[in-house]
Amino acid sequence: MSTFDKHDLSGIVGKHLVYTYDNGWNYELYIKNASTIDYRIHSGMVGNRWVKNQHVYVVRLAQDVYKVSWTEPTGTDVSLAANLADKIFHGTIFFPRWVMNNPEKTVCFQNDHLEEMAKFREAGPAYPTEVIDEFATLTVIRDVGENNESVIDCPPDQLPANFPENLKN
């Protein structure tokens, strides 16, 4: 009988992850608790976007392997898999057509623009959906504890010039 506990999220909750997709996009994710994340997008189509208190679903797939999934107010769906032991990350992002057509509309601190994001989403168009399916390399994995509001507390362009190297000290 297996002793694997698929409900044990202690290996991912409280982790701050920085990763670079194979396409060059840089992201940052903080697993704030078992149902909430904060994140920053450093580069790529929606670079300089950041979000706090995004509701998510977190599951444990295997030892040191977790999946985090959510739907954003923009209508974008995201599913991420993190293999912490091998520092391998995989993300699938389902962008509605309106985001692909006008990504700059989402480049903001989303929490201050929730009504606006909902209006954009409702106006659409939603289809055809653009699927971004990419592997990434985890460059920083650090334990910062649960519900730490200081982990992601400013836009990417206000971080130290040596980010994320400054985290490795």
Regions found by a protein language model. Name each.
Residues 1-25, 169:
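Tryptophan-anchored aromatic micro-motifs
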Residues 11-18, 34-38, 62-69:
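Short, hydrophobic/aromatic-rich segments at coil-to-beta transitions
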Residues 22, 40-42, 71, 94:
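Surface loops and adjacent helix of pleckstrin homology
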Residues 23, 31-36, 62, 85:
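Residue-level recognition of beta-strand termini and adjacent short loop/turns
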Residues 23-27, 49-54, 74-80, 88-90:
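Short, surface-exposed coil-to-beta transition loops
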Residues 28-59:
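N-terminal glycine/threonine-rich, aromatic-flanked beta-hairpin/loop signature
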Residues 54-74:
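Compact, well-ordered interaction domains used in eukaryotic information-processing assemblies
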Residues 69-169:
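Beta-sheet ligand-binding and adhesion/scaffold domains
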